[in-house]
Amino acid sequence: MFFTLIVFLTIISSLATFLLLFGDSPSFRNTPIQKLRNSLLSISRDIFQFYHWLDEKLNGQLLKILNWLVPVGYVMVVTVCFQQFLTHTLPMLSSPGLFRLFTIYFSMVLIYASTILATFSDPGRITTINLKSYPYTPNQLIFFDGKTCSTCHIAKPARSKHCSVCNQCFLLYDHHCVWINNCVGYYNYKWFMLFLISNINMLGYGGWLCYWALTPVSWRKITSTNNANKITGIFLILCSIFIVITTLFTFLHLRYIYLGVTTNELDKWSEIDHLVGLGVLYQIEPSIANENYVERAILDGNAVHISLKDERILIDNNNVKNFKLQLIQSVEDDLVNIYDHGFWNNLIERLKW
C-alpha cells in the first residue's frame, strides 16, 4: 500500500511539475495540455487569494512563513532519502570501495552546499556601489532610460526587476525560485545553476546506484520482498522521473543563455514579437527622446505612433514628415539583441564571480 501510494504521488507531482514548467510553451498552445495548465494555475490562484486574505488578518506574517515551506520541505525530504539510502540501499551494493563511497558522500554534501549558497546568497540588490560596475545599458526596446520602480522608488537599471515576493529590485533579474525561496539574479545565478547540476548529479548517480543494487533481484518481486528492495525501487522510480524534469529545466536555462535573455526578458521579447506579428512596430530615424522604436496605433480614426516606454504619442500627422519610418517585419532579421554576445560569453557573464 505504501509503495503504491508513493508511486501515485510521484506520478501526480511529476505531471503537475511538467504542466507548470512546459504547458505554456509554443508547442502546446491551444491543446488540452495548455488547458490543464491553465486550470491548475486557476486553482493555484484561488488558493493564493485565500492565503493573501488570511495573511492580511495575520499582519503579513503568514506568507513569509509559507514561502519557506518548499525549501524546508525539500531539505527534509532529501535528508530522509539520504538516510534511507545509506541504511537500506548502500548495503545492497557489493564492495562499494573508497572511491564510490567518496562520490556518494560528496554528492550529498554538494546538495546541501548548493542549496545553502543559492538560498542565502544576494541575487543582486541595487546599490550605488554595484551600479558603477554594472555592465548593461537600456536597449530602448524592452528596457528604457529614466524608468523608476513604482514600489521601491529607485531608478531601474536595464535588465532589473522588482520581485513582489522579496519586495526588492534586483539586477539582471531572472525569476523567483520557490525551491530556494530566493530570487535568481546577477550575483547568484551561478549558485542556482550549481543547485540544478547538483540535483541532476544526485538523481542520475543515485538512480544508477539503485539500478545496480536491484540488478541481482527479480524485478517482479520488488514489491513483495524485503523493505530494502521496496525502498530502493521507489528511489529508482523517483530518480528516473525527476532527473528528466530537472534536466529539461536546466537545458531550458541553457537555451535562454544561448539566446542572451533571462526568464523575465523572454516575456518582454514575446510582447515585441507580438507587435511585429501585428505589423505595428516601426524603427524611426532620427530618434525621439532617445527612443528608436514606436508602435503604430489608431486614435480618433488617425494613425499615430506611440512610445514603447510610456505610450505617449511621439509621431502624429503634424510631424510625421520629419521622420523615416521602417516597418519591423522580423524579430530575428530586423532587431538586434544587444545583450546577446554569443553563448560562451553569455555563459561567462551569467556565471559572474
Model-identified regions with their sequence ranges:
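Membrane-associated feature with strongest affinity for ZDHHC
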Residues: 1-165, 169-176, 180-353
